[in-house]
């Protein structure tokens, strides 16, 4: 009988990313700190989804899902760094970025359903920025 987290599509995508990123890293010629960080951040996505799904309180579940969300964004940044440092071609990371985008969307939805927003309200930010500009102009 599978564990509950194994039934989650987001968890399955996290495993898919871990497999994809492992294949990418094995093809890299040099070992870098970014490569090591990608492995840790990629693993963290699946691990935090699993742990969070096992928590009983919404607050605890949300905390682990937020960490998984952050790890997915970190993984995307690691891919960008590998390209920027010429460790791999930009065309080599497209599939990984696509998987990560899907994971981020799913985690955002899960957090939203738990009543936890992971982003500030854009209209409030825009209004505050406008108010600050007006105050500076005076």
Where does each model-flagged region fall?
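Amphipathic alpha-helical assembly/interaction segments
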Residues: 1-138
């Amino acid at each position: 009988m599978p564990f509950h987290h194994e039934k989650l599509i987001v968890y399955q995508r996290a495993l898919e990313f871990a497999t994809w990123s492992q294949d990418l890293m094995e093809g890299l010629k040099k070992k870098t700190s970014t490569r090591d960080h990608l492995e840790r951040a990629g693993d963290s996505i699946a691990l935090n989804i699993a742990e969070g799904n096992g928590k009983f309180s919404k607050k605890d579940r949300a905390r682990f899902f937020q960490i998984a969300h952050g790890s997915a964004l970190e993984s995307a940044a690691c891919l960008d760094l590998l390209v920027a440092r010429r460790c791999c071609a930009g065309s080599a990371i497209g599939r990984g970025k696509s998987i990560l985008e899907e994971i981020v969307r799913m985690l955002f939805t899960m957090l939203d359903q738990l009543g936890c927003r992971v982003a500030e309200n854009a209209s409030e930010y825009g209004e505050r920025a406008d108010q600050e500009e007006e105050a500076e102009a005076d």
